[in-house]
């Protein structure tokens, strides 16, 4: 719009040209006169030669402007009035009541806006009072606000007058107007009044023809600040401004009573009651001379402007040397006259801060679902970013998120384009430095560099945050750089807009507790703290006494000794000396929350014979349970660190760090451990316990028997999300020796009680709740931590049973990865099929009722092996020896983790046969051992998809035949193991060799090393998945995995989701494991798994469907095409977005849970669109029910196919549907007429499997069906009550057909969601069915089921009753459906 208007003069050049020009005089009386004069406005005081420069273009081009553009100009200027009112309200400081603001006038008899000729600031004289008896108050605006007001009156209002034109007449004569200059006021027209108003009053709504209303003005208070938990009303804001003016502005109130009294009067407060405070009986501005009253009020305004800093960045140069002729000459010399006007040379005003900046920063860093941990974290971020407190100390428990307290404000500062802020962060150790660099530079929100770069090269103008250690902070080079900051910046960047931001010191308690390093900290006292905008000190272990001593040790004043409010701090004389003399304000979140830290970690104190041996045992157990986890081990000495690293290196990958390493090496090793997923254990001295954030960390082991309470808390605090902490000490050797000058070591006993004592929390010794995560208490631990403890305990019991020593553990740990390990689980609850996994030693799984001479029976999900050869540590049982002509049966039942061998030995001249016939998908192994001259035959007949292994061991001169007959798709292995001097033959294929006869090319039974390596990889992957999805041993679903509560899952539960929900080709491959869709040799399912990965993948896909409409879901299926045959890979892909998906469901389905879970009532009268756009929403409950029964009566009489009718109003006949007696016949009738085929081709049902809709009529909705059938009697009573002829209410299958048809009817869905404003879109059929059965309040406040309202809306959309604009859509749907059907 402004481009269309052409060269409109801008604010700052115009202020310099007119308002700052000493040739323009503004000397005039400061009050309006009784008679209206045309020039009674400071606009009229501007010489004509200057006014001609301001608006000639707009006036000349007025006739060329279209009516639309003129209206756009007028409306745009109206929108600027409210922000200008707020600018004035805050700029004057001493608050107005709203009528004072509303009636500001720059001309006419009510004029109260003037320009002070000396200061060239706008001055306001107002005299509003409830009784009208007060004298005028004079308030002066700051320079910038004066520029805006002056520009608004002299430029924007004149533009608005030109745009509205001479015919504008929106204003009527109101009592607040003082219409003068007319002989007969009754003859004044609206056009005359409108012209007077436009040339007099500032804040108008020209569209409505009135002054700006209070409702419009207060809208800003309701909206801003956006993320404030509670907003002030106008009255509260007035009182707040008064309090600020009374307590904060100026420091001479105590010595100058007139100054104090003037401040009260300017806030419209009477001083007569302030006798005891001010020492005067009464005071008014009329009691002093006129000039004194003016000076008192001007000084009060000046104090406010200085205190608020409104002119701290405001510097103007007056163009007093230029005259009008020069300007006019410039105009004639160039068409671009605005380029010749003198410019204002001022420093760019500082971009204002907002509390919303922190929220924006959080979303940049963590994504759109970002939320603060709690209100304490939100308040502290705002305190650090917004408040003027120059020095802040924070104590929060380890793992609370202290880094975000300064990280988010730093990102917010970096977003300000007017000033470049350079901040510094210092940490105690180099180890922590590497971790901080990684965390703070993520997402690219901040430019982060080592502080060494700054010390050596100076500020580069790009870096937002320099990170260093305490040694850098104390270095002379750093303090010298800070001392010379202003000169360096001015010389390097030629600007003063590069400023020092925050000085942040993490874990600052070390200044006091690290006695041996205190000599190194001496240089910090030389640092110029006053150069920084703010100093922030953070720690998880700094109670008030420690914090105060630490701050004083580096040269600061220390903590505030008493609770001081901002008013006292502002008036403190010490403030003038800078930050170093300012007391630091302490925020102790641990005391505020009254929660003992570290309650989420299970802390175990154990006395053992050998600390390293016990630690190794714990670590190996952890990595067997959680292969991807990490651990930290804290040792006493540097020698012990290196010894442990050398001895443990053969078991897992370790990283070791101690103080004797160089800084670069420490950084490199820490970064390697944090970023490399294969690194398992970090071994070091206590320097590895502070500040490091490792996501996979699950265990901390402390071998140092001299740890003090701070070191203990810091070490345990590394376990952010819970885990195990072991304190290992030698028996009878726990020493309570105190190192000189340091805190004493922790004592034997309750750890939690010692933590409470350290933080100054209330002791609970001997009371309920004393033990929190210690002394065997598990009450406060998370479910994951409790499960980890139980799994560790179970593993310890098994190891004790097997009598394994710690030295043998690694080999058995590796051995368990081999392909010889028994396979115990392969099937899933969803499928009746059994998966088959062959191993090297011919294992057997036989189903019930199989007939076998050598029979092995295994329990559910247990693998059984019948073989003659047993490996080490495997028990062999069930051995039978028969005499001549005997019949042999060897039957074995194997329990968990036991290998079973069934062996039969026959005597001379005995013929033994082992014949097995198995059922579908069985795995059979038949083993026979014969003596001399015996004849042995092992024959197996298998059915489809079977896996058969026949193994024979023959003694000297024996003859062995292993024959296998397999049907289609069978997999056969014939293996012979020879004893001494034995010979064997394989006759599976007489003319072929072993390489050609393998049916499974993946497994090479002759390559043992290859087999072992492959099996180890599979086992490792299996353990990873088990750790990632641990609850699949229970009847869990994907909503539990996402983190929903049980009451939410109850209503969001994804019932009816099975393999048929997935489109063809998605997780539906055959011939593979039914649980994970991998080849049998690569199966990653594990023993005891009740919910397969494939089922989880189905449900995960359903969750994604919940969040997407049809088009988005179709695109999503294309996006995940690489995972169509890999449900395990898809689950990993899905779990990456776990938090985001959870938040999105919470947002999108909040209304759904409110209706279904909390049973919030839906009232049709609350839907404005419904009442206006549908007759149904004005019907009573009785009328809706009558209409519902009538629709079903008509459908029954005409034998109309229900699903097709509700899908697109097609009235095809289907008599078989109405005559069907059971669900099977009903579905067959629908399938016969092609309903399901049309549904898939026309609607989003095509995005599911071909059987999905059909199976809805069989087994998925039992609970809903039961509820519906129980309600049939109620429907009969309703019909009798309504006086209608009782008709049969639709049976369940017809009712379900109706709801399915409505669900896939896109036109109806869009209409219903538009009319019924309380509901939104649902994309899963189960959710739609649940929603349809909630109750709504009709227009007469009677309750009816929502499905009855749906049928009424559907009927209204029928061709005879379709609203305007919808008939063509219905016809199109009908035509397309008939075409498909025919």
UniProtKB/Swiss-Prot annotation:
Family: Belongs to the helicase family. Yeast subtelomeric Y' repeat subfamily.
Stretches assigned to the Helicase ATP-binding domain: 383-560
Record function comment: Catalyzes DNA unwinding and is involved in telomerase-independent telomere maintenance.
Originating organism: Saccharomyces cerevisiae (strain ATCC 204508 / S288c)
UniProt biased composition (Basic and acidic residues): 984-1007
Binding-site residues, ATP: 396-403
Superkingdom of origin organism: Eukaryota
Other facts noted in the record for this chain: The protein tested in started on residue 386; there are 4 identical proteins in yeast.
Lineage of source species: Eukaryota, Fungi, Dikarya, Ascomycota, Saccharomycotina
Name of this chain's protein: Y' element ATP-dependent helicase protein 1 copy 4
EC id: 5.6.2.-
Gene designation per UniProt: YRF1-4
Compositional bias annotation for Low complexity: 880-983
Region (Disordered): 840-864, 880-1007
SMART domains assigned: DEXDc (SM00487), HELICc (SM00490)
A GO term from the CC aspect: cytoplasm
């Amino acid at each position: 719009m402004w481009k269309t208007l052409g060269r409109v003069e801008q604010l700052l050049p115009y202020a310099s040209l007119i308002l700052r020009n000493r040739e323009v005089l503004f000397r005039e009386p400061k009050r309006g006169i009784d008679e209206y004069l045309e020039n009674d406005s400071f606009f009229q005081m501007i010489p004509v030669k200057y006014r001609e420069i301001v608006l000639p273009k707009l006036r000349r081009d007025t006739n060329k402007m279209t009516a639309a553009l003129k209206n756009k100009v007028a409306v745009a200027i109206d929108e600027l009035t409210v922000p200008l009112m707020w600018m004035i309200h805050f700029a004057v400081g001493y608050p107005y009541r709203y009528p004072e603001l509303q009636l500001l006038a720059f001309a006419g008899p009510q004029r109260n806006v003037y320009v002070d000729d000396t200061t060239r600031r706008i001055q306001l004289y107002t005299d509003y009072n409830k009784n009208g008896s007060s004298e005028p108050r004079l308030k002066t605006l700051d320079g910038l606000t004066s520029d805006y007001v002056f520009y608004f009156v002299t430029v924007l209002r004149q533009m608005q007058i030109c745009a509205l034109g001479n015919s504008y007449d929106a204003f009527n004569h109101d009592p607040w107007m003082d219409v003068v200059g007319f002989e007969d006021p009754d003859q004044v027209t609206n056009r005359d009044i409108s012209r007077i108003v436009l040339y007099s009053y500032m804040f108008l709504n020209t569209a409505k023809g009135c002054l700006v209303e209070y409702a419009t003005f207060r809208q800003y208070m309701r909206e801003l600040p956006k993320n404030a938990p509670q907003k002030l009303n106008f009255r509260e804001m007035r009182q707040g401004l008064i309090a600020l003016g009374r307590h904060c502005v100026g420091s001479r109130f105590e010595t100058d009573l007139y100054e104090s009294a003037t401040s009260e009067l300017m806030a419209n407060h009477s001083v007569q009651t302030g006798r005891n405070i001010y020492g005067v009986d009464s005071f008014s501005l009329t009691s002093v001379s006129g000039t004194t009253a003016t000076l008192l009020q001007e000084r009060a305004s000046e104090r406010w402007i200085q205190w608020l800093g409104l002119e701290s960045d405001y510097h103007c140069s007056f163009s007093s040397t230029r005259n009008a002729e020069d300007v006019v000459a410039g105009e004639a010399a160039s068409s671009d006259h605005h380029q010749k006007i003198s410019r204002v040379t001022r420093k760019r005003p500082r971009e204002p801060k907002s509390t919303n900046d922190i929220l924006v920063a959080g979303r940049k860093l963590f994504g759109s679902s970002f939320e603060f941990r709690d209100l304490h974290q939100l308040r502290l971020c705002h305190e650090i970013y917004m408040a003027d407190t120059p020095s802040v100390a924070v104590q929060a428990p380890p793992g609370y998120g202290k880094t975000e307290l300064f990280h988010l404000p730093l990102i917010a500062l970096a977003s300000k384009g007017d000033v470049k802020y350079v901040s510094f962060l210092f940490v105690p150790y180099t180890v922590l430095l590497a971790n901080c660099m990684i965390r703070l530079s993520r997402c690219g929100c901040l430019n982060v560099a080592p502080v060494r770069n700054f010390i050596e090269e100076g500020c580069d103008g790009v870096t937002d945050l320099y990170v260093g250690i305490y040694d850098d902070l104390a270095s002379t080079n750093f303090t010298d750089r800070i001392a010379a900051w202003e000169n360096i910046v001015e010389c390097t960047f030629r600007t003063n807009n590069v400023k020092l931001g925050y000085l942040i010191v993490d874990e600052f308690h070390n200044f006091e507790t690290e006695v041996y390093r205190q000599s190194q900290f001496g240089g910090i006292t030389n640092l110029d703290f006053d150069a920084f905008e703010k100093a922030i000190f953070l720690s998880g272990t700094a109670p008030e006494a420690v914090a105060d001593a630490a701050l004083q040790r580096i040269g600061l004043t220390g903590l505030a000794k008493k609770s001081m409010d901002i008013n006292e701090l502002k008036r403190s004389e010490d403030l003038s000396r800078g930050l170093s003399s300012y007391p630091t304000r302490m925020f102790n979140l641990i005391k505020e929350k009254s929660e003992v830290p570290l309650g989420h970690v299970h802390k175990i104190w154990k006395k053992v014979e050998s600390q390293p041996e016990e630690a190794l045992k714990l670590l190996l157990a952890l990595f067997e349970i959680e292969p991807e986890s990490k651990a930290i081990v804290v040792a006493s000495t540097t020698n012990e660190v290196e010894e442990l690293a050398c001895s443990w290196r053969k078991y897992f990958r370790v990283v070791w760090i101690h103080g004797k390493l160089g800084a670069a090496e420490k950084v490199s090793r820490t970064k390697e451990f944090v970023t490399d997923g294969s690194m398992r254990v970090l071994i070091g001295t206590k320097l590895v316990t502070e500040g490091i954030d490792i996501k996979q960390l699950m265990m901390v082991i402390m071998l140092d028997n001299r740890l003090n309470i701070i070191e203990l808390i810091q070490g345990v605090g590394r376990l952010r999300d819970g885990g195990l902490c072991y304190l290992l000490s030698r028996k009878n050797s726990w020493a309570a020796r105190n190192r000189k000058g340091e805190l004493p070591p922790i004592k034997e006993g309750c750890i939690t009680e010692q933590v409470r004592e350290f933080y100054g929390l209330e002791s609970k010794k001997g009371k309920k709740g004393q033990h929190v995560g210690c002394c065997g208490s598990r009450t406060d631990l998370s479910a994951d931590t409790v499960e980890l403890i139980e799994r560790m305990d179970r593993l310890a019991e098994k190891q004790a049973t097997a009598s394994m020593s710690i030295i043998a553990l690694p080999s058995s740990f590796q051995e368990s990865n081999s392909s010889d390990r028994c396979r115990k689980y392969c099937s899933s609850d969803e499928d009746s099929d059994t998966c088959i996994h062959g191993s090297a030693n011919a294992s057997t799984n036989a189903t019930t009722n199989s007939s076998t001479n050598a029979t092995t029976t295994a329990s559910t999900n247990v693998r059984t092996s019948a073989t003659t050869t047993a490996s080490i540590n495997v028990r062999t049982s069930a051995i039978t020896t028969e005499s001549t002509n005997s019949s042999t049966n060897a039957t074995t039942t194997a329990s968990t983790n036991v290998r079973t061998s069934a062996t039969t030995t026959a005597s001379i001249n005995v013929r033994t046969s082992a014949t097995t016939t198995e059922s579908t998908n069985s795995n059979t192994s038949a083993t026979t051992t014969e003596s001399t001259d015996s004849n042995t035959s092992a024959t197996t007949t298998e059915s489809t998809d079977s896996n058969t292994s026949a193994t024979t061991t023959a003694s000297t001169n024996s003859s062995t035949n292993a024959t296998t007959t397999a049907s289609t798709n069978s997999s056969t292995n014939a293996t012979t193991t020879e004893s001494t001097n034995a010979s064997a033959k394989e006759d599976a294929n007489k003319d072929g060799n072993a390489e050609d006869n393998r049916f499974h090319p993946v497994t090479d039974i002759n390559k043992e090393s290859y087999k072992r390596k492959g099996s180890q990889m599979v086992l490792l992957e299996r353990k990873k998945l088990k750790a990632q999805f641990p609850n699949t041993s229970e009847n869990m679903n994907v909503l539990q995995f996402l983190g929903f509560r049980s009451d939410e899952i109850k209503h969001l539960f994804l019932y009816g989701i099975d393999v048929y929900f997935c489109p063809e080709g998605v997780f539906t491959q055959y011939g593979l494991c039914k649980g994970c869709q991998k080849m049998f040799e690569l199966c990653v399912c594990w023993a005891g798994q009740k919910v397969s990965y494939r089922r989880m993948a189905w449900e995960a896909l359903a969750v994604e469907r919940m969040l997407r409409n049809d088009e988005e879901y179709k695109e999503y299926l294309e996006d995940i095409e690489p995972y169509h045959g890999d449900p395990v890979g898809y689950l990993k892909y899905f779990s990456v977005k776990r938090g985001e998906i959870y938040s999105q469901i919470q947002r999108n389905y909040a209304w759904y849970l409110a209706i279904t879970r909390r049973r919030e009532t839906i009232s049709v009268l609350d839907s404005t669109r419904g009442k206006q756009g549908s007759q149904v929403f004005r019907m009573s409950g009785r009328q809706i029910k009558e209409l519902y029964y009538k629709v079903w009566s008509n459908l029954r009489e005409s034998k109309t196919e229900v699903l097709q009718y509700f899908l697109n109003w097609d009235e095809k006949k289907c008599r078989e549907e109405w005559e069907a007696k059971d669900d099977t016949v009903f579905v067959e009738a629908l399938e016969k007429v092609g309903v399901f085929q049309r549904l898939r081709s026309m609607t989003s049902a095509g995005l599911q499997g071909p059987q999905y809709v059909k199976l809805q009529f069989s087994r998925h909705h039992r609970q809903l069906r039961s509820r519906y059938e129980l309600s049939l009697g109620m429907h009969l009573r309703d019909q009798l009550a309504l006086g209608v002829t009782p008709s049969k209410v639709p049976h369940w299958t017809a009712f379900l057909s109706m709801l399915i048809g409505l669900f896939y009817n896109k036109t109806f869905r869009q209409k219903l969601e538009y009319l019924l404003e309380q509901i939104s879109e649902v994309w899963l059929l189960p959710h739609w069915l649940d929603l349809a059965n909630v109750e709504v309040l009709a227009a007469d406040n009677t309750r009816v089921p929502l499905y009855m309202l749906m049928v009424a809306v559907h009927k209204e959309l029928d061709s005879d009753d379709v609203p305007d604009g919808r008939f063509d859509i219905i016809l199109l749907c009908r035509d397309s459906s008939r075409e498909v059907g025919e």
